[in-house]
Amino acid sequence: MKRTVFIFVFLCAAFLLGAQSHISTQPHQEAVSVITPAAQESDFSKAYVSAGKDGFLIKWTEDNQGEHYQISEYEIKAAAVSPDGRFIAVYETDGGLVNRLALWDWETLSRKWARRYKDSVTSLSFTENGTYIIAGTATVSGAEFIRTATGDVAVGKIKDATGIVSYAVTNSTEKTAAMYSPAGNLSFYDLTTGRAKQRISVMQGLSQAVLFNNFLFLAGVKDDTLYVVYCISGKTITSIRTSNPILLASKSDRNLYYLENDGKGLYTLKMLENADNRTVSNPKIVRMFKGPRGNEAITSGAKLGNEIMLGSASGAVYKITADADSALSSIEPITQDIYDRILDMAPIGEDFYFLTKDSLFRSSYDTGIVKRLGDNPGRTQLITYGDSVILWSKDTRLPILLFDYSLPEVKTLYIPKTSLHSLRLFGNLLVDLESSSSVNVYDIEKGALREAYSGAGLQDCVIAADSKLYVAKSFATNPRCALLAVDLETGETVPTALAGNVAFGLSVRENDIYGVSVQENAGTKRTSVFRYNTAAKQTVSVANFTGEFPDAFTYLYFPSLYTNIGQNVGQNTIRAINLTDRKNIIFNRSASMPIKAACNAARAVILNRDGSISWYDGTSSQVLADWYLTKEGQWFEF
């Protein structure tokens, strides 16, 4: 079925370095990790920032419109907004080796600075006037005061080791800081001297620790129990059994609000009322409502004045008020998921294929026609093969399929033996890499599958014009090389002289193999884009960059080589290197980070992490359009 494209133009904001955000009611694609106010309680309008596992920051305004911008390929575990609302500090992590703290200027959508940590960041906040960012770390030294303007640590701001800190805040003059340590300490520091003024022993192991009523009370959760501590004495003045609570308070709130979830979709907003600045009341029910449950349950929230914004495990965002209401109501998200995420794409003549979860489409920028070719039988990647399509799924053992949509007919080619890492097509030969240890070749015409090479630390593989298989690998595994040649007839393997600790991201044109190599020398890592000529057996450096880019790729559409390394700081852009004159075009990015490029004679198209695409003419850095495919098979243009 052909469908003329209906392009609805939405608002967009363009900033420095060509960055642009998208304004919509689209939710996060994964769980909302944190919600934080982006305005002061005294401000006339209310604004919030939500951050998610999808690496997106979304600034929500009072009209429930969200300004979307993806800053990381990792989860954003914590976020804080500067008092003036301009800067957003974020903690990004992969849950292991990557622990990065960065400051973003929301007006220009640019990263001002970034810092890396060996250990996790346990708390993140701005000082009252925004002069410093307080970062708690999972080390004995504990909290750091980082100058907002420069990203430098203010050495000596705290002279006493704080230990692990999970909550930190300052007073209005920024002369006093209060910090809670899960070890069971609530400490007050004189920031003019850097010394502790007072240290109070309190309940250990509290999560969601927060001060309220102007530093008089400390609240936190432990083992499904809500505790409130009187800060002057350190005495626990109340403990309340609760279910999946989310604390909703700030240091200026007189009362403590918290949201309970019974796990069956019933939520109760409760309040502990400040009685006499020494005690709090028993829990008072403010309102009850039915909401999402299971893997869509509400998991985060923030209160600003009388308004509360909530985030869920599915990425949806909700908004309620703290007004008392005795009626049982139901809440609906302010977000609406209207897009069909594009999983993969490939050129076909003057058009491109686009694969979504349920369908295969064919379309182009110039004609504006969307044609649905058929159902997607549960695959995530595609390869153009004549007038047919090869469908497969990365990191699975799902059968590799040949889809002839003109019939339509789906044929199983073969089933991978282990988890499929990559699949490439060279003429009638499919070359796969399974579990980073085995390379197999499948002859489509003969229906024959055979193992061509096995080893360890394998990264990528291509077949060059000499009909040999070239395997990129780790230098640390035998044979000791980063790229080796395999004779597909005899099985003979010959190491090449390509330098580097590891090679990956290969592309090939006749006898020239292009790829990415990483080399470490004296603790410094450098990433190179290389060209290896199989006939001359010589390597030429195409481009060199400082640092390591483990997710780098190359895509060749001669004379341009597309790659995502050498990115503008924090911008995650794609560049096209002209292989004849070495000139570079750095493409302005969309609201989402780019992950793949594809080209035909007329257009270049980039696939973004959120499933949108960005169109370019291939000769200019300017975005022609950002398109999202709706669930009705129509294009939305930003």
Where are these regions (language model features)?
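A short beta-strand motif characteristic of beta-propeller blades
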Residues: 21-25, 65-70, 110-115, 153-159, ...
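Repeated scaffold domains used in trafficking and secretory/extracellular systems
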Residues: 75-80, 119-125, 162-169, 204-211, ...
